Structure formats: C-alpha cells, structure tokens
C-alpha cells in the first residue's frame, strides 16, 4: 500500500495519549503472558511429562536510558518452543538516511514510539505459528499501525478453508467491523501483500490483517477511534489464538510433520531478515537487538 500524506501537528494532549497507549500495550502483554502460561499448564498430549514453561522477563534500556526502553518476556516450554511477548517505548532522533521513510520525520527527526510485538513458535506442528504487533508512533504527526497474521506450518493446513484460518480471519473481521476507522477487506489485502516472500513467490502464511499510518479525521472519531480499534485488535488476538492453540496442542504428530515445520520456519527467517519493516525499523533506531531478533524460531531447516 502506498504511504499516505498524514496531517502535520500534534494535539495539545499528546502526552496523555502517549501514556494511555503505553499503558494499554503493557496491560495486553501481561494478559497474554498469563494466558499462555495457563496453556502450558493444561497440556495433556505429547510432551505433557515435561515441565510447563514460564515467561522470563528482562528489562532493557535504549541509549543508556536516555532513549526509553522496554521489556522482553520470553518463554521456552512444552507447548511453545519459543514465544516472545515484548513491549517497548522508545524516543530519540531518526538517522538521516531513515528520515524520508517515516511520515513527519523529514521536517523534524525526533520521534516517540510505543508498542507490543509477539511471535510464537509452538512445538506441535499442528499448532500454527503466529505474529501480532500494534504500535503508536509520534513524529510531527502521529498514527497507529499493526496487525496479526497466522502461519500454519503443515501444507495440508495452509489452505483458506482450514478451520484455524477461518476462525482467525473471522475474529479479525469482527474486530474491524466494530469500527468506522477500520476497513477489513483493505487490511486483509494489505496483510496478504505485505507478508509475501517475493523471491519464492509464496505467502508467509494464511494471512490476517495489517494496517499502518492510521490517523483518522475527527469527523469519524480521530485518535480515540483509532486507539479503540487498535485495542480491539489486541483483544481479538488474545481470545482467538489461545483458542486455536487449545484446539490443536494435544494432537499427535510425526517426524515428517516436524521436518515440514522446520522447513516452513526457514521461510519465516527469510521473510523477517529480508522484508520485515519492524525488524529494519528496530535495528535502525537503536532498538534492542536481542529483542528484535527474538522473533526468529529456535530451530530451522533448509532442504
């Protein structure tokens, strides 16, 4: 999607809005972490003889505390081979080569950004991998962005009619349809176009939604409406993905399934290192490298 021309200027209460957004992202993080630990506790199928996983939280500072920071929450368990739920609130100045790529940064390089980012790589190949991210960015303008997308790792499950994909898309569609500022068909198409491996001519997964540069006119609710939609994306994800995990996590799998999973994870690595804007943004703005690259799966295979 082509980047729009966003209005310049910040509202008088921008500090309040920044604080509200930051608090929401951190609250959502805590909710998801608690729900994922409950899933670890409830496993009854393969590997249930192993200890249930628990998140390990690690706080980090950007620029020795002069540019904000965040919290990495990582877990390696018997359901989730690797899952990271991260929040960050950072500020500073964009480097010269990056300013023209960000709305409002060419006029003034200063920025503020807060958000939550999640990636889950389950043990069981029947459970799809997932990614979710929502954020608020402030330059001389301000906007929201984010989305959620599902990546089944078995070819027989990578079809639009698979029950997991149908359920996931329906949850995102309902979240969008509650809000005038959201456009489900547009955001779904945007996701399909964004999460695409051009060099392999194939999608990363079975899609979801993706949006960016969301700054709506006051006539349809402005910042408050955009924030309400962004919250609903997070809430919808926090309900639908645990449901998908619980539907599949006790199912048996074969060594062939595991091999197929590891090859599909290789595609995930290729996308994140070659195309992902969030990865590039984080590395170019002095983000926490360990946190940024934690989205990569723990084990992969290239045939």
UniProtKB/Swiss-Prot annotation:
PROSITE patterns hit by this protein: COPROGEN_OXIDASE
Binding site for a divalent metal cation: 121, 131, 169, 199
Subcellular location: Cytoplasm
Cofactors (names): a divalent metal cation
Keywords: Cytoplasm, Heme biosynthesis, Metal-binding, Oxidoreductase, Porphyrin biosynthesis
GO function terms (MF aspect): coproporphyrinogen oxidase activity; metal ion binding; protein homodimerization activity
UniProt entry tagged with the keyword Glycoprotein: no
GO annotation terms (biological process): protoporphyrinogen IX biosynthetic process
Record: residues binding substrate: 117, 133-135, 286-288
EC number: 1.3.3.3
Catalytic-site annotation from UniProt: 131
Start and end residues of each stretch annotated as Important for dimerization: 268-303
Record pathway: Porphyrin-containing compound metabolism; protoporphyrin-IX biosynthesis; protoporphyrinogen-IX from coproporphyrinogen-III (O2 route): step 1/1
Role this protein plays: Involved in the heme biosynthesis. Catalyzes the aerobic oxidative decarboxylation of propionate groups of rings A and B of coproporphyrinogen-III to yield the vinyl groups in protoporphyrinogen-IX.
Family to which the UniProt record says this protein belongs: Belongs to the aerobic coproporphyrinogen-III oxidase family.
Assembly, per entry: Homodimer.
HAMAP family (UniProt xref): Coprogen_oxidas
The protein's name: Oxygen-dependent coproporphyrinogen-III oxidase
The organism of origin for this protein: Sinorhizobium medicae (strain WSM419) (Ensifer medicae)
Upper taxonomic lineage: Bacteria, Pseudomonadati, Pseudomonadota, Alphaproteobacteria, Hyphomicrobiales
